[in-house]
Amino acid sequence: MNLKILGIDPGSRNCGYAIIEANKGKNILIEAGLIKIKPSTLQYQITELCEGLDLIFKNHSFDEVAIEDIFFAYNPKTVLKLAQFRGALSLKILQIHGDFAEYTPLQVKKAVTGKAKATKEQVAFMVKRLLGLSKDIKPLDITDAIAVALTHAANLRVRV
């Protein structure tokens, strides 16, 4: 059974997204990109993020949605801002799609590379390899989103 999965890597400057089709252990990248968030007031940035997500859902339907949880940051302002973006994304996904899966950065790294402490570059290398792509995927926000989708696909196979 083919499953269309949306993976999301939330960020305060860019939000990576990836759409994969998963079928019996074979994953195909359908689309990947960024929701670019321009420097502005927090309210405008959140609006921009939600509008970008609306557009993705308008152009595609999904069986599953997975999002990466926010990472630990040392700057409290950064944590608060990311938490607000994450909250807005969560609400938007719940309104449009319903339930979604959440994975920590360590879970994603472990699922894709086998190492919970892998670097972003190691994740990018494995994403490229797992999908059989010839070109590097840039920026790393996009590879992270693909990794989230791949993690969810692997998790679904384990549960089935």
Curated annotation (Swiss-Prot):
**Compartment list:** Cytoplasm
Query: What Pfam families would the database entry show?
Result: RuvC (PF02075)
Task: Spell out the catalytic residues.
Answer: 9, 68, 141
Biological process (GO) annotations held by this record are:
DNA recombination; DNA repair
The residues that hold Mg(2+) 2 are 68
Q: How is the cofactor bound?
A: Binds 2 Mg(2+) ion per subunit.
- Cofactor(s) for this UniProt protein: Mg(2+)
List the catalytic activities from the record.
Endonucleolytic cleavage at a junction such as a reciprocal single-stranded crossover between two homologous DNA duplexes (Holliday junction)
What is any one of the record's Gene Ontology cellular component terms? Holliday junction resolvase complex
CDD domains listed in its UniProt record: RuvC (cd16962)
Q: What residues does Mg(2+) 1 bind to?
A: 9, 141
Q: Which GO terms describe its molecular function?
A: crossover junction DNA endonuclease activity; DNA binding; magnesium ion binding
Q: How does it assemble?
A: Homodimer which binds Holliday junction (HJ) DNA. The HJ becomes 2-fold symmetrical on binding to RuvC with unstacked arms; it has a different conformation from HJ DNA in complex with RuvA. In the full resolvosome a probable DNA-RuvA(4)-RuvB(12)-RuvC(2) complex forms which resolves the HJ.
Its biological function? The RuvA-RuvB-RuvC complex processes Holliday junction (HJ) DNA during genetic recombination and DNA repair. Endonuclease that resolves HJ intermediates. Cleaves cruciform DNA by making single-stranded nicks across the HJ at symmetrical positions within the homologous arms, yielding a 5'-phosphate and a 3'-hydroxyl group; requires a central core of homology in the junction. The consensus cleavage sequence is 5'-(A/T)TT(C/G)-3'. Cleavage occurs on the 3'-side of the TT dinucleotide at the point of strand exchange.
Sequence similarity:
Belongs to the RuvC family.
Q: What is this protein called?
A: Crossover junction endodeoxyribonuclease RuvC
